[in-house]
Amino acid sequence: MSVNMDELRHQVMINQFVLTAGCAADQAKQLLQAAHWQFETALSSFFQEANIPSHHQMMCTPRNTPATPPNFPDAITMFSKLRASECPGGGVSAGGGSSAQVSMACSPPHASFWASPPPNQQPVWLPPSSPTGHHTLHHHHHHMHPPPSWPPVSQPANGPQTPVISALHGQR
């Protein structure tokens, strides 16, 4: 039973090494065996090997790590298509695609999201609601008035949230 358990443990370590380093399974097995199945030692030797210029032909490059995007020109193209002006629209592109939804999912939230106070708190600054000035700051009223936002925006704060949420759930 212990032999099977060791084999299983070695296979799990190989798989974990492949996921961590982004190399092939046979290379991971060789490095782990050379390091006497010490994961950190094998990982350290893998990345030290990557820094030696003479090993570039033999080295297996990482596949999909944050430092190396899957396809760099495509990533640049996607970033160049993102426009800040697309976010408030919330519509679908003319071709029927969902590029506006994707750009909203990748962009920061709408400006009113950052400017408005939390819904359960009274805003610090209240604009006068009537020209005669009947309302004062100590007059706390909890009616269903929308909280003021600065800078003023033409789109309501609840508008673009639904497409963003549906776009995010659709990508999973």
Swiss-Prot record:
Residue segments, region Disordered: 118-172
Compositionally biased spans, kind Pro residues: 118-130
InterPro entries recorded: UBA-like_sf, UBA_8, UBALD1/2
Superkingdom to which the source organism belongs: Eukaryota
Pfam families reported for this sequence: UBA_8
Compositionally biased residues, Basic residues: 135-145
Annotated family: Belongs to the UBALD family.
Entry protein name: UBA-like domain-containing protein 2
Organism annotation: Danio rerio (Zebrafish)
Encoding gene (name): ubald2
